[in-house]
Amino acid sequence: MADATHAAADGGVATILASADGRDFLLRNSADKVKISSIKASTVALYFSASWCPPCRRFTPKLIEAYNELVSQGKSFEVVFVSGDSDQDAFNAYFAKMPWLAVPFSDSEALAKLNERYKVMGIPHLVILDAKSGEIYTEDGVELVHEYGTEAYPFTTERINELKEQEKAAKDNQTIHSLFGTPTRDYLITNKGDKVPISDLEGKYVGLCFVVNGYGPVVQFTSVLAKIYEKLKAVGEKFEVVMVSLDGDEESFNESFADMPWLAIPQGDKMCEKLARYFELSGLPMLVLIGPDGKTLNDDIADIIDEHGPDAWEGFPFSAEKLEILAEKAKAKAESQTLESLLVTGDLDFVLGKDGAKVPVSELVGKTVLLYFSAKWCPPCRAFLPKLVNEYNKIKEKHNDFEIVFISSDREQSSYDEFFSGMPWLALPLGDERKQQLSKIFKITGIPSLVAIGPDGKTVTKDAKTPLVAHGADAFPFTEEKLQELEKEKEKKINDMAKGWPEKLKHDLHDHELVLTRCTTYGCDGCDEMGDSWSYRCKECDFDLHPKCALEEKGDVEMGEENAEAAPAGYVCEGDVCRKV
């Protein structure tokens, strides 16, 4: 560290970091004691962190990088670790990686007082102080290090405002070089390692594609974007894509970049984080469109790509006029929809029967087909399956021109195989590329979902599950006319069926009183199957029982699976559906 004014012995950090029992030192990870009065830094950061905290473990390397860079630049800066670990060994192992000072773990009173003084409600937490006066520069040190890195030093309000002004000026004067270049780098790279001058992008439309290796939505998005990219190249459009990797290591970067046909900012370049901040990245996938003049045309066209898939190239360069044309084409495509246009992609012109037999899609043409989006890991899907199997068999007894195709969201072949083994219908193979496109066409955001396709290949309804649960096999063929007819009949039956049922009751499966409630579909917390129309419900606990289950003499209905699979990342299960988040 560079020399700076000593912290005052009777104020500032000298007072803040000392203990009531006279301790006047901090520790290095070598166990050496450092007099607090000897700290020469003018800016001191208190780092509240703990080894058991995953966000802390992710942030600590970033703070170490910033600290080392500031020290190497001769900046007057110090960090003091304030541990939230539960034992000395955990403290020692975590502190061993840190190049700065720490309050002794044994001084639990001082640690508690610091947490109380700065009202620490969560970690990691970085409070940055004027060492001499103890004045708080900021309590948002974690966010500032994430956003600005060492440029935020000395973390004063004046410096942060200055950086914001610089960002505004940069946006006002944005060029392709200011976006992608640095004082020491005027090139991008290919996945072969070749350097391509940034000047080659002048006069072109450029997409900035933010990428994280292995993240499902990004992997799916970039596979579609690659098709659009190749098509635009083939028709001679001046279009380029630049990958902006948010991965922290070279292996992940290389794995992401290996199959991409476009350019990238080199791995580890700080410009990647700057661009994420510059364009206020809040979610992935994200694709920013830059015009031929280097100005931003659209902050994010990922939704356009997501909605139209590979056909989105026809909307390039995604102006209002082009998007209107694209929407018209999408409408016309929907109107000309056939079962084969939905289920046939290149050589993928089949679905799977039992024992892996390939059934040509052509054999399904002219039938009413339900597309069943589901997964074994999803509790509502497991609860719905017995009902669906039962009604499927009833429909097939009367109507041979009917079929279901299972479209799985499972991640493992074993789970897929086990779940499919209990289904008497057909399926797409696990991981089939048609699943992604069908999910987009029908905007599937939760499972289980049932989409009904009529004999003419047109969509009858995107929600066949609700009428099937309500009316069973009688809902076939799921047309609006049929459902209106059934609703009239059902309304009368519903009112008649509840005659004689108690309005309220107590049941062994729940502590609170259950109230007879008119409702739509729900999952019974007694037998784990679907129900509708009437439930004995506890609104306070969101607890439901079928009237049949509730009115049994004993509350010994078998409860749900104890060892159910957990939902994978990106899904949350609530009630009778698992949704993407």
From Swiss-Prot:
One of its GO terms (molecular function) is thioredoxin-disulfide reductase (NADPH) activity. It is an enzyme of class 1 (oxidoreductase). It comes from the Eukaryota. Its EC number is 1.8.1.8. Signal peptide: none annotated. Coiled coil: none annotated. The keyword Oxidoreductase applies. Keywords: NAD, Oxidoreductase, Repeat. Residues 1-165, 178-322, 328-488 form the Thioredoxin domain. Disulfide bonds: none annotated. InterPro entries: C1-like_sf, DC1, Nucleoredoxin-like, Thioredoxin-like_fold, Thioredoxin-like_sf, Thioredoxin_CS, Thioredoxin_domain, TryX_NRX_thioredoxin_dom. PROSITE patterns: THIOREDOXIN_1, THIOREDOXIN_2. The keyword Cell inner membrane does not apply. It catalyses: [protein]-dithiol + NAD(+) = [protein]-disulfide + NADH + H(+); [protein]-dithiol + NADP(+) = [protein]-disulfide + NADPH + H(+). Belongs to the nucleoredoxin family. Probable thiol-disulfide oxidoreductase that may participate in various redox reactions. This is Probable nucleoredoxin 1-2. It comes from Oryza sativa subsp. japonica (Rice).
